[in-house]
Design a protein with these regions (language model features):
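PLP-dependent class I/II
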Residues: 1-204
Length: 204
């Protein structure tokens, strides 16, 4: 309603929309109202779900022909945005029935990983804040209080993890000044091992 009141056009990055955890549901931005449908550029890609990031297979859905023409014009200025034959067939193949079955199984695995990591962190890493994600395979740890109490910086904490083979990511580019971003897209046994290493060697 606010967007409609001020005639705002929306660019919605919905690249994670396939990866929904537990019983949660994804609501496409374009589905919430007729105004949203006609004033949203929704962007998708198979790269997160099917690990196809290198193939330049992203795409957009635009119902408004005027906005679509504007986006097509801007996109055409760089040949990098053009699909190639390999990426086109990879995209088609990903969204066949087998791809849907793969995605269902993937979400079950990721849900188990996220639930385990969330419970483990809350049980073992006092003063580390974490929220159970509803989607994606990323987990964001807020280490503000932990770092303050232990007198170390987030850079030092991140280095500790890397030093014991837990490759995690600086959370600052994701609006978390003292955060660490963890990728949980891996076998469950490795999630267990990573948490065990963090308990023994990092959050000590």
């Amino acid at each position: 309603e606010i967007y409609e009141k001020y005639q705002v056009e929306v660019v919605a990055d919905e690249i994670w929309s396939d990866i929904i955890l537990g019983d949660h549901q994804f609501v496409p931005t374009q589905s919430v109202s007729e105004y949203a449908r006609m004033h949203t550029v929704a962007m998708y890609a198979p790269s997160k779900t099917f690990n196809l990031a290198g193939l330049v297979g992203s795409y957009h859905i635009i119902y408004n022909p005027v906005i679509r023409d504007r986006v097509k014009k801007e996109s055409s200025l760089s040949h990098y945005n053009e699909m190639n034959v390999l990426s086109m067939y990879a995209l088609i193949g990903a969204y066949q029935q087998e791809g849907y079955e793969w995605t269902d199984e993937l979400c079950k695995v990721l849900t188990k990983n996220a639930e385990y990591a969330y419970d483990y962190i809350r049980s073992h890493f006092k003063d580390v804040q974490v929220a159970m994600p509803q989607g994606t395979y990323m987990l964001l740890l807020d280490c503000t209080e932990w770092c303050r109490k232990h007198g170390i910086t987030i850079d030092e904490l991140q280095k500790r993890g890397v030093g014991v083979g837990v490759i995690w990511q600086d959370g600052r580019p994701f609006h978390s000044p003292c955060g660490i971003r963890m990728n949980l897209a891996l076998p469950f046994s490795l999630v267990e091992e990573a948490m065990d290493r963090l308990r023994k060697y990092v959050f000590v």
